[in-house]
Amino acid sequence: AGWLDRWYGLWTPSVLVMFAFFTASTDGLLRRRFMLSCVFLWGLGCWLYVALPALGPIYYVPEIWKDFAAKIPAASAMHEALWANYQKMLAGRNGVLREFNPIYAIAAMPSLHVAAHALFVLWSWRHARPIAWVFILATFLTFLGSLVTGWHYAVDGYAGILLAVASYRLAFVFERGEDRKSTRLNSSH
């Protein structure tokens, strides 16, 4: 479980690497489609958080994770920080909201961690097949890590994957055009 805790911590660097990889393309259509799919993913994901507010099982049934917390120290520390911030937000409902940090907000449905990696699978499969295999594994590990650490229920990950597929497809609807063959790093299409 400790290695999944550490894996989950690599999520942000993996996202930044993929942003850099696809936005460095000389194909303007690819860059626009990729970034538009990310806008859809994050934008729709945030609206789904508002429409379907949910906390992960770590917050709903914290006693399950008490004995397990030592095995996932990074997640446990973040659980506590996010929960403290959430309590400040709840206290702000009765007056002025003070000391709330929106970066430390809690939302579970859908899992945007799983969704982002799934979106990278779709883009890599089309344009950089060797990287796709890495992100298939990354999506699986992130999904598994989200369950083990208590951040998400399984349905949150499934919803994230569906959101990734929808975001990918919407990018093609709104940015029409033909792919340049030279942008594909894989030999099979």
Predicted regions and their residues:
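Conserved small/polar residues in nucleotide/adenosyl-binding loops
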Residues: 179-188
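Aromatic-anchored segments of alpha-helical transmembrane domains
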Residues: 42-50, 139-148
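Membrane-interfacial alpha-helical segments at the cytosolic side of multi-pass membrane proteins
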Residues: 17-24, 114-132, 162-171
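Interfacial helix-loop-helix junctions of multi-pass membrane proteins
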Residues: 56-57, 108, 141-167
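N-terminal transmembrane-helix/juxtamembrane module of multi-pass inner/ER membrane proteins
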Residues: 1-17
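Membrane-interfacial catalytic/cofactor-binding modules of polytopic membrane enzymes
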Residues: 51-126
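Interfacial segments of alpha-helical transmembrane regions
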Residues: 16-53, 58-69
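Divalent metal-coordination and catalytic microenvironments
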Residues: 12, 34, 53, 113, ...
